[in-house]
A protein has these predicted regions:
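Start-transfer (signal-anchor) and selected internal transmembrane alpha helices
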Residues: 1-25, 29-30, 34-85, 342-348, ...
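Short acidic/glycine- and proline-prone juxtamembrane loop motifs at membrane-interface regions
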Residues: 273-280
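Membrane-lumen/periplasm interface segments of multi-pass, membrane-embedded glycan/lipid transferases
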Residues: 359-446, 554
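Perimembrane helix-loop-helix junctions
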Residues: 290-299, 321-352
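Transmembrane helical bundles and short interhelical boundary loops of multi-pass, membrane-embedded
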Residues: 23-50, 353-372, 518-557
Length: 557
């Protein structure tokens, strides 16, 4: 007769969990050792103990969350922060898009420099860090050519694009991100002096303040350039976590969808970096969460307007679209002081004011910079591209559609990390499935009998998502893409995270009407956080694996 785990004493159940975690750690270490030849690089005992200890720590963290965190929002926030910590350390230095420039600007702010001076240089420690960890590390270390296959003697082309580890010959040493750490940590004994590093072409201050606080604290504790990087990442992650916690607390419906998006590996990858996308994504998620509230009071309207103004500091003009959802709140649902048009006008005026003020500040306090060329070179011209788009609307639509098709509509690139140079196939394949699971759980039977949000809210948010996606594509096409090019340059999956979140409630409504899931809202919310937290932990492990363990591309030169 089978034994039901629920009837076993809690101590026995947790004892079995500890045993299972240890066994899984041993098996995972064995897989790494066999498939990636890890025994030639690291002691088998170290690998085995490390994997087992890691899973035991994860189990302990899960127990603490279950035991001490009360409520959906609290549990979600703790999981976001803990899983984000894994990404902060699994992701090598400066490997988030544009993180090298973000690091330099954040470092300057952390030392009290709130202006922008191209003649100002950084300490040698910072220069050594940027030398050891170039942005787009995988692309920077990619090799291509023609070699000879030792088994057949035939010539064979090779290309290490997408591989962080490579090996020249079967007996050669494996080159990996670990070499960059060794290079940086050995800079004290090197005779060479690094090339001086000056301030980047980046003229924002406010979005980098959380990371700057983390760097300042790390410096007070005696850490160098590398420690400052991790300190900045952790405080940036804390800011992302607080915004997500507020969003989960304010959301009244579809909370499984919010938790799933917030715990996506791509969201945590950006949230636990020095990118201002950490707070940008948090504000997007917060604004969408507020749209699920049945009634809006002055506090709700104030939080929404503040978030709307903030996102326009980091990403101006396009984010003015976020003023419009205020009108999705019906008149009978509006309890804030002042009418909706007045709040919308205030949000629009505030957003335009901070945009113009940011542009003025970046120009007025900019010193010793030469003429700043357009990204993409002389072939990029916004005015000419806009005129080309207006003259050729059908061709532009074809270019947009072709770009989406080439990039799996960006929903199939939720596992594309680094500077778009490190694909993790498992996460690319399973990312859409996780979103589908989130929609299914968000379609659970609501606690209240009255259906809310209304079609007006859900449909309006979905329409906003589509317009925002089209606007993001148009902005990149006009400002970053050479005139007349048939594909858009620079689009990334992270730009569409808020789009997927805005579309999930609409998908949940369709699923509720078609398959009528029997699961209750309470059970759905109880299930989504541990499931997505486990997926996030696995994503962090895969990110670490692809940078430090394998797969290894063997080059036969």
């Amino acid at each position: 007769m089978p034994i039901k785990l629920q009837k076993l004493p809690a101590a026995v159940r947790w004892g079995l969990a500890v045993l299972c975690a240890a066994v899984c750690g041993v098996l995972w270490a064995y897989y790494w050792r066999v498939f990636f030849g890890l025994d030639n690089r690291v002691s088998p005992l170290v690998v085995t103990l490390g994997c087992a200890a890691f899973l035991e720590v994860c189990l302990l963290a899960g127990y603490c969350v279950r035991r001490f965190a009360k409520g959906f929002a609290a549990k979600g926030a703790v999981c976001i922060f803990l899983c984000g910590l894994l990404f902060a350390f699994a992701n090598p230095p400066l490997q988030t898009p544009d993180e090298a420039d973000h690091y330099l600007r954040t470092y300057a702010i952390s030392t009290g420099h709130f202006d922008f001076d191209a003649s100002r240089t950084y300490p040698d420690d910072v220069a050594y860090l940027l030398e050891a960890f170039p942005g787009a590390w995988v692309n920077a270390h990619t090799s291509a050519g023609v070699g000879t296959d030792p088994d057949t003697g035939a010539e064979k082309a090779y290309n290490t694009a997408g591989y962080a580890l490579k090996q020249y010959g079967k007996e050669g040493a494996v080159q990996s991100m670990a070499d960059s750490f060794a290079l940086y940590l050995a800079h004290d004994v090197r005779d060479s002096v690094p090339d001086p590093v000056s301030e980047p072409v980046s003229f924002l201050v406010i979005p980098f303040l959380p990371g700057a606080v983390g760097m300042a604290l790390a410096r007070l504790l005696g850490f160098g350039a590398l420690g400052c990087l991790y300190g900045g990442r952790i405080v940036n992650l804390l800011a992302y976590t607080l915004l997500c916690a507020l969003a989960l607390a304010k959301a009244e419906r579809y909370r499984p969808a919010f938790a799933a998006i917030m715990l996506l590996p791509m969201s945590l990858f950006m949230g636990a970096s020095l990118s201002y996308d950490a707070t940008l994504l948090g504000c997007y998620y917060l604004m969408l969460a507020l749209l699920t509230r049945k009634e809006w009071n002055t506090q709700t309207a104030g939080i929404y307007t503040a978030a709307c103004i903030f996102v326009n500091i980091a990403k101006p003009y396009l984010n003015l679209l976020w003023v419009l959802p205020i009108f999705l709140v019906a008149k009978r649902e509006w309890y804030a002081k002042g009418c909706r048009p007045l709040w919308a006008l205030g949000g629009f005026g505030g957003a335009m004011a901070v945009t113009l003020l940011t542009e003025w500040y970046g120009t007025a306090f900019r010193y010793n910079y030469p003429m700043i060329e357009r990204q993409g070179g002389s072939t990029v011209n916004g005015g000419e591209q806009l005129a080309f788009v207006l003259r050729n609307p059908l061709r532009t639509i074809a270019a947009f559609w072709g770009t989406l098709g080439e990039n799996d509509f960006f929903i199939g690139q939720l596992g594309l990390f680094g500077w778009k140079d490190l694909p993790i196939s498992f996460l690319n394949l399973t990312g859409p499935l996780v979103l589908l699971l989130a929609a299914l759980l968000a379609a659970a039977q609501p606690k209240r009998a009255d259906a809310f949000p209304t079609r007006r809210r859900v449909g309006g948010a979905a329409l906003l998502a589509l317009v925002y996606a089209a606007g993001a594509m148009a902005a990149m096409y006009i400002t970053y893409t050479p005139v007349g090019m048939v594909r858009i340059v620079g689009l990334q999956a992270r730009y569409f995270l808020c789009v997927w979140l805005a579309l999930l409630p609409a998908l949940a409504v369709l699923l509720r009407k078609t398959i009528r899931p029997a699961i209750t809202e309470e059970k759905a919310e109880a299930a989504i956080t541990p499931l997505c937290a486990c997926y996030a932990v696995f994503g962090a492990v895969l990110l670490f694996q692809h940078y430090f363990v394998g797969p290894v591309y063997v080059v036969y030169a």
